[in-house]
Amino acid sequence: YWPAYMSNLAETAKPMINYIDDMRYYGRIAAKEYAGIESKDGQENGWLVHTQATPFGWTTPGWNYYWGWSPAANAWMMQNVYDYYKFTKDETYLKEKIYPMLKETAKFWNSFLHYDQASDRWVSSPSYSPEHGTITIGNTFDQSLVWQLFHDYMEVANHLNVDKDLVTEVKAKFDKLKPLHINKEGRIKEWYEEDSPQFTNEGIENNHRHVSHLVGLFPGTLFSKDQAEYLEAARATLNHRGDGGTGWSKANKIN
């Protein structure tokens, strides 16, 4: 859906938004079972989805956590949803459709994040970089997507002048997500712990097709032209990873 808005086809994104909105119903079941976050009748306390979904309510990780567990997928979807407003400026749609979705997703992460004292971060845990490497806490992929979600949620809530208490809680965690770090080779870290002697490089491929740790560069807005060191590290990351991969990852790298 990346081209839908930029090609002036925002109306083609509405079925996607409706699909995600409907997914929240079953996603609340997944949030209860996998994260202990319960929404009783009429409540919208958080929903969960991973790398697979169907029109029939599939929101669980699948049969292999290595590629299936991806709780920040809900945050990534919200970026596509919020983009509708950024391109159309439809205030009614923002208030009635988009904001409730953003709010519930932000509430999930406000509850699900764990504080890691060693790194002074609020982290996603457990955390997999999609189909690559080992399990960690607070990897760059998850942290970047939650950063984007919280950024967008606070922007909308402040614009609508609503839910000040939740915004305050989200802001406190947002400031300690700390998604971007540069490793000793001058590249963006994919895993926070990767320079540690205890870090295992099991399953790591230098030319892996995904560059999940650059999700904040595209399609996210985490990187800034005023942060030259991160942009140079991102360039080094792309050069190191190479141009191989399947269709989706090639499009991601090109963008």
Q: What is each residue range found by the language model?
A:
Residues P3-I29, E33, I37-G42, Y66-E91, ...:
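Active-site core of glycosidic bond-cleaving carbohydrate-active enzymes
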Residues V49-W69, S125-N139, F199-T200:
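Acidic/His metal-coordination segments adjacent to aromatic residues that form catalytic metal sites
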Residues N80-D83, L102, K107-F112, F218:
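Structured mid-domain segments that build the active-site/substrate or prosthetic-cofactor binding neighborhood
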Residues T88, L94-F108, D116:
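Serine-hydrolase-like catalytic core of hydrolytic proteins
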Residues E104-H159:
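Acidic/histidine-rich catalytic neighborhood
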